A protein has these predicted regions:
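ATP/NTP-dependent adenylation/nucleotidyl-transfer catalytic domains that generate, transfer
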Residues: 132-231
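ATP-dependent adenylation/nucleotidyltransferase module used to activate substrates
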Residues: 1-136, 231
Length: 231
């Protein structure tokens, strides 16, 4: 299990308790320090966090993941078998039949240690399929699902909805504090901050909006005053 330093603690405890044989792979550098080093926080368009902590880890191996098409529009474009490359433009996709035809060449690709093969065996499963399978086989699940979470990933993931991120910073206030510290440091390094405080930089970041839209919604709308025309 690749840790990112922004994993929900409930997930880590669940894995350690129920799957003690799973190896916890700690990152060489926390995502906070990585953001400071890069001078920018991860965003929906600039998802360097995925490349650093998820996609390139495990190069040279076949990795099974639980991605499903029903989860999002982006994931609906995934295929059952994919080669993961650090460069998204060079990634390839196959179904099982195509993978069998190219298996020899794919193994050679994995052998160079620069790519990994990712297999999504439940890609076409629905939410009901997942829960039916878990209940039928008495497989335990993380408590976060019982607390209203539909999907679990990194806390404050840029790909999550704003509503999800607002809930997460309420549940995990330490993550918010850490990111605000990062905002202060990247501001010192010269990241364009439009004169915002680290707290406002964080609010802008989790909104996922452009600076103009975020600023207009947060500050300009508060300045509007409507003349009372009633007599």
């Amino acid at each position: 299990m690749n840790l990112t330093s922004v994993d929900p603690p409930e997930v880590i405890r669940f894995v350690r308790k129920n799957y003690p044989e799973v190896e916890m792979i700690k990152p060489k550098m926390s995502i906070y320090n990585m953001a400071v080093e890069k001078g920018i926080l991860p965003t929906m368009r600039l998802r360097w966090c995925c490349a650093e902590y998820k996609e390139t880890s495990g190069a040279g191996y076949i990795t099974l993941i639980g991605v499903r098409k029903a989860e999002s529009v982006r994931r609906s474009k995934r295929e059952i078998v994919e080669s993961m490359n650090a460069n998204p433009k060079k990634r390839k996709q196959w179904n099982f039949d195509q993978f069998s035809e190219h298996e020899e060449s794919l193994v050679q690709c994995m052998g160079n240690g620069k790519e990994k093969i990712v297999v999504s065996p439940i890609l076409y499963w629905t939410d009901d399929d997942v829960w039916t399978f878990l209940k039928a086989n008495n497989i335990k699940h993380c408590s976060l699902y019982d607390n209203g979470y539909r999907r679990i990933g990194c806390i404050c993931c840029p790909m999550s909805s704003f509503k999800q991120k607002v809930r997460e910073i309420k549940d995990y206030p330490h993550v918010k504090k850490n990111w605000i510290k990062v905002c202060a440091k990247v501001k010192e390094k010269g990241l364009e901050s439009y004169g915002l405080s680290p707290d406002d930089m964080f609010d802008w970041w989790i909104s996922g909006k452009s600076y103009k839209r975020w600023y207009a919604e947060k500050y300009l709308q508060q300045k509007f005053k409507f003349k009372d025309t009633t007599e």
